Amino acid sequence: MASVTSIVKAADFILSRPTLSRVVVPVSKLFCAYAGYREMGLKFNDIIAEENPIMTKAISRLPEDLSYARNYRIITAHQLALSHQLLPPSKAVKPEEDTHYLIPYILEAEKEAFEKQELDNIEV
């Protein structure tokens, strides 16, 4: 599995190349539009798997208001999935509202985990 750090570096590389950016950005926007998570009230960072120590640490570092909002969105999405419904377009998450609120915390937790691994494996 790729780390979020490597994904961010790849995204920065793509965005720094105008030709790649003209091809990849519209495709990624189309993918996000058809993925359907926004129609269930979720943001992209809400669908990242949280069953690993780095994600658990990143989620625990979220400010209280972001954490409550995230939990509310996930519970709402579960309820919509159980009832086989989607949010009306007025309540669905808009593309400009779909911010990467969790990525800085994940990058920080990955950096700390990498540093800890390096220090644990140091040879004197």
For each feature predicted by the language model, list its residue ranges.
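Hydrophobic membrane-targeting and insertion signals
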Residues: 1-7
